[in-house]
Amino acid sequence: HVVRSLAGHLARTFPASTRALLLYPQGLDAACAFWACVCAGLVPVPAPAPDPIRLKYGLPRLRSIIEDAHVSLTLTTSRIAALSSELSLANETGPITWVATDQPYDSIDSIEWPQPQGNALAYLQYTSGSTATPRGVMISQRNVLAHCKALSLAGGVSDSSRSLCWLPYFHDYGL
């Protein structure tokens, strides 16, 4: 229900293929925002939430990702969105719209959901930037399905299987 209502809000408010930076603490909010973007036809760009203690390191990395990915939207929590003016994140085309996703959105029943195409961009994954500027990798819908199939075959996954991942959502294996 959370993913569907947020996806409906995003689909009504932003054009398809909008690049959406995801800035969340580790948890379900990040997963819901990621899948809401996918369902709405937006392109999620997962990144670590800024750590107030390490802003000197984190902000240049975030700014690099925003510029490279042409981000125009940030999805996050109300707590992090309240810091938006302090973070001064923008891109070359202007300010970034901030949306706090931890508030309820109306359920959407009559929306035409986009149908993903195999070569369409599913999401942008960025390297950590620990040794250089973060570099983005374009992950297609086909890449996601092939990866899921490979993991299913290697892990003996069935319809009744459940999994748990402790990696951060912005890590390539965290998704």
Whereabouts are the PLM-identified features?
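Conserved pre-ATP/AMP-binding loop-to-beta segment of ANL
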Residues: 98-133, 138, 143, 147, ...
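Short acidic, glycine/proline-enriched helix-loop-strand junctions
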Residues: 84-101
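Conserved ATP-dependent adenylate/AMP-binding module captured primarily in the ANL superfamily
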Residues: 8-9, 50-86, 107-109, 147-164
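Generic beta-strand/beta-sheet core signal
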Residues: 23, 77, 124, 137-142, ...
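Conserved AMP-binding/adenylate-forming
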Residues: 6-53, 166-168
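Conserved AMP-binding loop of ANL adenylate-forming enzymes
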Residues: 22, 154-175
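Motif I (Walker A/P-loop) of helicase-class P-loop NTPases
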Residues: 33, 140, 175
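Short, well-ordered alpha-helical microsegments
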Residues: 28-31, 81-84, 174
